[in-house]
Design a protein with these regions (language model features):
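Signature aromatic-anchored transmembrane alpha helix within multi-pass, membrane-resident enzymes
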Residues: 82, 128-135, 168-172, 310, ...
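Perimembrane helix-loop-helix junctions
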Residues: 120-124, 149-174, 179, 183, ...
């Protein structure tokens, strides 16, 4: 199910990093994702195929997610984890992310491993667990730094003398990737890009509450929608009817679970590990809600997928004490899931709207072609186009002034926006689209041709 094209800007940056890692040139963007890129680059060197390299990491990540989810089940002394395993394995978003040229799924596997050792620390207070916890946190910083706020509640460990082993493990594993990254980037360059990109993420382009126009209400709606619609194929407008069946099952499981928790059992003797689990997810929820791009990037909700899968597992268990009945319920729930996931994975193998534009321009036979677009799309086309007859220009006032020159030289002009200066020219519009539930970013694009 691996893909063979760059579906968006972020995928391109990670794909290019496998060939030539350079944070200064956004291959990939800061903070560099050094450990992920190191692994990706080495697998790519063996396979010479970025799709296979990415899906290999994705496959290992799925294995680790399921393995340590089972370990967590046993650690919490819960039974019948088989339902959750199947729900996770057939999850459409996990399948898509396992093939996307990004570190998110690998980061999720590390988050679950790290959380497992945090719970072990709470239950057993062993030095080994403190050390491993610190090491994995350091590795996580080199794979998916934005998942680290999940562990802010673990700061309570500072009152335990053994936390020094976690600090030691963190310093060793972080130093193993950060020192080489600073060395190859240059100390001054690293500080400069750290300052610029950190400020840019929070205040300019990062899609945070400080840089976007979306209200807190809209951000909350998007977050919940992404968790259920993208994460678990809940019904939404223009989706296949099978998502309605899927949604009914999810609602039934949730209602049954909440009845069991709040009406049949009194919330007594809540253990510390349960409180910490709640606080970890609350911490990450607040972080994503305020400081991540949830306008069109559902991938930031990935840590909630194992939690919802666990809740669905418990919902199935709460409906019946008879295992045969549970198995029937699970099969009926998974049948539409298999259909939905299969369709989304097949659609993912087809080009995104942005990649379709690239293919369209590659097939342009005219010897004189110029493309006007915004900076991000120009970056994408500049790194992917094979057609050497095409000039790429950013849409700005200075380049607008060159329009007359290209017209006089008989250039064919393409633009991602309508050009008022060419209103007298013959205009053709081309439409490119993909399923937004495969990738929310730029699912519909237009290209305007002037001759």
């Amino acid at each position: 199910t691996n893909i063979s094209y760059y579906e968006d800007i972020d995928s391109l940056r990670f794909g290019l990093s496998a060939i030539d890692f350079n944070v200064l040139e956004s291959r990939p963007h800061f903070p560099g994702y050094a450990i992920y890129c190191f692994i990706l680059q080495n697998i790519f060197n063996l396979t010479n195929d970025i799709g296979i390299a990415t899906s290999s990491i994705g496959g290992i990540s799925i294995f680790l997610i399921i393995l340590y989810s089972i370990k967590l089940f046993k650690l919490f002394k819960l039974s019948d984890f088989e339902y959750m395993v199947l729900i996770l394995f057939l999850n459409p978003f996990i399948w898509i992310m396992s093939n996307r040229y990004m570190p998110d799924l690998f980061g999720l596997s590390l988050l679950i491993i790290c959380f497992y050792y945090l719970i072990r620390i709470i239950k057993f207070n062993e030095i080994k667990d403190f050390l491993i916890f610190g090491i994995i946190i350091g590795i996580q910083c080199g794979v998916r730094l934005s998942y680290v706020p999940f562990f802010l509640p673990a700061l309570f460990l500072i009152f335990n003398v053994k936390v020094m082993y976690s600090i030691l493990g963190f310093l060793i594993s972080t130093g193993a990737w950060l020192i080489p990254l600073v060395y190859i980037t240059g100390y001054e360059n690293f500080l400069e890009i750290f300052k610029n990109d950190t400020h840019g993420h929070f205040y300019k382009w990062g899609g945070t509450i400080l840089s976007s126009e979306s209200s807190l209400k809209i951000r909350l709606y998007n977050l919940i929608e992404y968790v259920f619609v993208d994460g678990f194929s809940f019904w939404a407008k223009n989706r296949n009817w099978t998502t309605i069946i899927n949604s009914i099952f999810i609602l039934v499981f949730f209602v049954s679970l909440f009845k069991k928790v709040f009406f049949k059992r009194k919330l007594k003797n809540i253990k510390l590990e349960t409180v910490i689990t709640f606080l970890c997810f609350l911490s990450y929820f607040i972080w994503v809600l305020l400081f991540q791009n949830i306008n069109y990037k559902p991938r930031h909700i990935m840590p909630f997928i194992p939690l919802i899968a666990f809740m669905l597992n418990e919902g199935i268990r709460s409906l019946s004490d008879v295992k045969t009945n549970r198995a029937i319920l699970l099969i009926l729930f998974l049948l539409p899931n298999i259909y939905i996931t299969s369709n989304l994975v097949i659609q993912h193998k087809k080009e995104s709207a942005l990649s379709q534009i690239k293919t369209f321009l590659d097939e342009e036979e005219h010897k004189k072609v110029v493309v006007f677009s915004d900076g991000l799309k120009i970056f994408y086309l500049d790194n992917t186009l094979r057609n050497k007859n095409i000039k790429l220009l950013n849409l700005n006032k200075r380049n607008y002034e060159q329009l007359k020159k290209f017209i006089d030289l008989d250039y064919k002009i393409y633009s991602s926006m309508k050009l008022n200066e060419l209103s007298n020219f013959e205009l053709e519009e081309y439409f490119f689209f993909h399923n937004p539930h495969v990738n929310r970013l730029w699912s519909q694009l237009k290209l305007y041709k002037y001759e």
